[in-house]
């Protein structure tokens, strides 16, 4: 089948770029973060099925839920020559190892053969690599914020947080929730402390300076500056919450899925997570969906609760291996074209950020989706995650040591210094 197969997109026909004939029955090896527990897994499966039906090709899907182990496996596959044909992955420094190794193809190079590739995306919203080129076609974006279980809050006499929610009020709410016999914060410090760290950093700094990163001197000693001070203070805030007993009793051993279930089942009041959880709760906790509300992470210092974290952090890469395979090149291009078309991305986007030139239209939002849309109206500032601006090794070191910090085995300063030494 020709790579110029027409695909409908938002009520009009968009033609996929064509340079080569797609070999009949091509099998594409694809890796994404749309694992079985991802809220968009069903949308992903539907989109892949649509590609297979339209092209006659088959997708060998090796998707898994995104975490540090998954990232490590992806990078290891590139190192051993086992990389996929198409990869849906982070577009920040996490992608530097395989970009710098020449293992993926730039959009600029692809456009030499397929001029219309990714032209439905805003150039300004596509990630730029250190060489000044673009490599990933962006998918739907994200936001991170506070999810609340309104049933738990009601039982504890606590109000749903608004855009003026403060840290002091939050601490008082946590005290009341704990005294009422509920878990204040659903979080696995063992597996996913990421979200609490991100907002704790912003709470000890500002939106404008959020992307500032600590540094070490030539001797490997952490430099005392505003960036290092706010990172240290962030870890100390998390330690304060731990010592107060506001996390689950097994926060240092439980998996993220277990603590999220505590929130979903009405055992815990608060959860910081991302926009992808809208689909997750709709799929896995449909009977309780009315209990969940998207609210605001408590603000502290210069940060109001209406400043949040968000952006577009992931996209589709075509690997050099697929590009240089005559049997797979056009099939890989067609796959990315299909997955990032307005029609397909429209199924992934409800309240998320999008790079699509024409945007998407949504209707018939569920109660939790509508609460997200309502909360987003009050957003006063948006910053990308600063943790995504440090190396994978530095990030792993930082988050592995958070349990040590909260239990007093390591100081917050030591943890930040150890992480930045690996940056």
Question: Locations of the language-model features?
Answer:
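Conserved C-terminal helix/tail region of periplasmic/extracytoplasmic solute-binding proteins
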Residues: 59, 154, 345-346, 354-365, ...
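Short, solvent-exposed loop/beta-turn-alpha elements that line the ligand-binding surface or hinge
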Residues: 108-120, 162-163, 205-233, 283-287, ...
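Extracytoplasmic/periplasmic substrate-recognition and gating elements
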Residues: 26, 32, 49, 53-54, ...
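Conserved N-terminal structural module of periplasmic/extracytoplasmic solute-binding proteins
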Residues: 4, 10-96, 100-101, 111-114, ...
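Glycine-centered hinge/linker elements that transmit conformational signals in sensory
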Residues: 172-176, 217-252
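Hinge/lid segment of periplasmic solute-binding proteins
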Residues: 22, 90-148, 168-171, 196-202, ...
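Extracytoplasmic/periplasmic solute-binding protein
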Residues: 130-139, 144, 169-221, 239, ...
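A structural signal for short loop-to-beta-strand junctions that line the ligand-binding cleft
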Residues: 76-77, 84-85, 114-153, 174, ...
């Amino acid at each position: 089948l020709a790579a110029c197969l027409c695909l409908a997109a938002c009520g009009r026909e968009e033609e996929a770029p064509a340079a080569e004939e797609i070999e009949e029955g091509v099998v594409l090896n694809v890796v994404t973060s749309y694992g079985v527990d991802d809220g968009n897994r069903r949308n992903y499966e539907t989109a892949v099925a649509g590609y297979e039906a339209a092209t006659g090709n088959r997708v060998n899907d090796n998707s898994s839920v995104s975490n540090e182990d998954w990232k490590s496996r992806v990078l290891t596959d590139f190192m051993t020559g086992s990389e996929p044909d198409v990869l849906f992955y982070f577009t920040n420094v996490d992608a530097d190892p395989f970009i710098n190794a020449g293992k993926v193809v730039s959009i600029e190079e692809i456009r030499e053969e397929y001029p219309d590739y990714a032209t439905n995306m805003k150039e300004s919203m596509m990630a730029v690599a250190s060489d000044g080129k673009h490599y990933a076609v962006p998918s739907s974006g994200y936001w991170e914020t506070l999810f609340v279980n309104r049933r738990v809050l009601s039982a504890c006499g606590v109000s749903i947080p608004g855009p003026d929610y403060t840290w002091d009020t939050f601490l008082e709410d946590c005290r009341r929730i704990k005294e009422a016999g509920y878990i204040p914060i659903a979080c696995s410090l063992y597996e996913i402390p990421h979200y609490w760290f991100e907002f704790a950093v912003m709470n000890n700094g500002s939106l404008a300076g959020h992307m500032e990163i600590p540094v070490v001197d030539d001797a490997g000693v952490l430099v005392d500056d505003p960036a290092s001070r706010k990172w240290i203070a962030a870890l100390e805030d998390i330690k304060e919450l731990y010592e107060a007993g506001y996390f689950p009793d097994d926060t240092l051993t439980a998996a993220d899925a277990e603590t999220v279930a505590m929130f979903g089942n009405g055992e815990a009041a608060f959860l910081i997570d991302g926009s992808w959880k809208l689909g997750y709760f709709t799929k896995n906790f449909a009977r309780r969906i009315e209990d969940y509300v998207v609210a605001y992470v408590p603000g502290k210092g210069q940060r109001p609760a209406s400043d949040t974290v968000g952006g577009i952090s992931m996209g589709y890469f075509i690997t050099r291996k697929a590009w240089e395979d005559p049997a797979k090149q056009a099939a890989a291009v067609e796959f990315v074209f299909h997955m990032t078309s307005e029609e397909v991305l429209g199924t992934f986007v409800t309240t998320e950020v999008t790079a699509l030139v024409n945007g998407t239209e949504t209707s018939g939002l569920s109660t939790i989706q509508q609460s997200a849309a309502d909360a987003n109206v009050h957003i006063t500032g948006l910053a990308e995650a600063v943790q995504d601006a440090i190396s994978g090794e530095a990030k792993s070191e930082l988050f592995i040591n958070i349990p040590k910090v909260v239990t007093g085995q390591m100081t917050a300063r030591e943890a930040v210094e150890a992480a930045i030494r690996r940056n």
